[in-house]
Amino acid sequence: MQNPTIVIGVIGADCHAVGNKVLDRVFTMHNFSVINLGVMVSQDEYIDAAIETGAQAIVVSSIYGHGEVDCIGMRENCVERGIGEILLYVGGNLVIGKHDFSEIETKFKGMGFNRVFAPDTDLELVCSLMKRDIERVMQSEEAPEGMQ
């Protein structure tokens, strides 16, 4: 399998760059082709980059706690732009205040994200899960019609 292309960045008005650099390095070390949009990224910028590069996934991160607001409508915007089936991942400190992570995960999955990662999730696990998801999608796209 060719190295999967992923678009990463920090959404909204969030300017926390260090975690983004760590993600870029880890994903690159795990043979992802990383398109890193940096910080303060809009939904349209993620989607534009995914379309331009043929990315298999978009990885949204947020540290400042407003990811819940910044991510509203992301899946719908992907559908509207013709990439409705793209894998969407989100992680970090996604909401303000202390909440049970299962509530946060349910909320973001309800927004159309395929996986939601807590701030303390092991990045090795993240890479493994993303690769498995991407391989599964690519295999289903390659299967003859009726064999999926």
UniProtKB/Swiss-Prot annotation:
GO terms for molecular function: cobalamin binding; metal ion binding; methylaspartate mutase activity. Pfam families: B12-binding. It catalyses: (2S,3S)-3-methyl-L-aspartate = L-glutamate. Adenosylcob(III)alamin binds at residues 13-17, 61-63, 93-97. Transmembrane segments: none annotated. Its cofactor is adenosylcob(III)alamin. NCBIfam families: MthylAspMutase (TIGR01501), PRK02261.1 (NF002612). CDD domains: Glm_B12_BD. It comes from Yersinia enterocolitica serotype O:8 / biotype 1B (strain NCTC 13174 / 8081). Keywords: Cobalamin, Cobalt, Isomerase, Metal-binding. This is Glutamate mutase sigma subunit. Pathway: Amino-acid degradation; L-glutamate degradation via mesaconate pathway; acetate and pyruvate from L-glutamate: step 1/4. GO terms for biological process: anaerobic glutamate catabolic process; glutamate catabolic process via L-citramalate.
